[in-house]
Amino acid sequence: HDALPILQEAINVQIAAEMWSSNLYLSMSFYFKKLGYDGFASWMRKQSQEELEHAYNLADYVSKRGGVAKVDKIDVVPQEWESVLDAFENVYKHECHVSSLIDELVNVASSEKDKASQDFLWGYVREQVEEEATALGIVEKLKRCKDEASILYMDEKQGEIGRAHV
């Protein structure tokens, strides 16, 4: 299929972006663990695993189409944030950024008239709607936390979610 070389390059860039996302969320997991927020740490580790799965799935797709998946340079991720809220605001901003990257991939597939890739990538578009909504929901709840006890309660709840999906 003639469209694959152009898409292959774009998807390989996305593979690196997904791996960077995985590293970012793993770094956040370590940050939360250091602060004693085991629930947030567990939830972020689950998110890290999901991003790595995205990279694997993208690589598998390139291979199925007869292309070659590559791992490009992955930049260093932040290690510290100002607060729990700041970290989750960064998660939300990052998920919005990932959505824009996925949208651009869909645009490339569309311009190349590659229906199979469009179909494959629409799954990521749908998933990003959920990822953004989840991150924004956590941010909005954290903004309502007025004391450490309420943050600890949220930490416990996110931990239950993180452990349930590992």
Regions found by a protein language model. Give the residues of each.
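Short, small-residue-biased leader/transition segments that mark boundaries at the very start
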Residues: 1-4, 165
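Membrane-interacting alpha-helical segments
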Residues: 5-8, 141-145
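Residue-level recognition of alpha-helical structural elements
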Residues: 7, 37-40, 84, 113-117, ...
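Acidic/histidine-rich alpha-helical segments that form the ligand environment
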Residues: 10-17, 21, 25-28, 32, ...
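Conserved alpha-helical segments that form or flank metal/cofactor-binding pockets of metalloenzymes
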Residues: 32-73, 135-139
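Short alpha-helix boundary/capping elements
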Residues: 67-70, 129, 162
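A general secondary-structure junction signal
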Residues: 73-75, 158
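Acidic/histidine-enriched, glycine/proline-rich intrinsically disordered or flexible terminal extensions
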Residues: 147-163
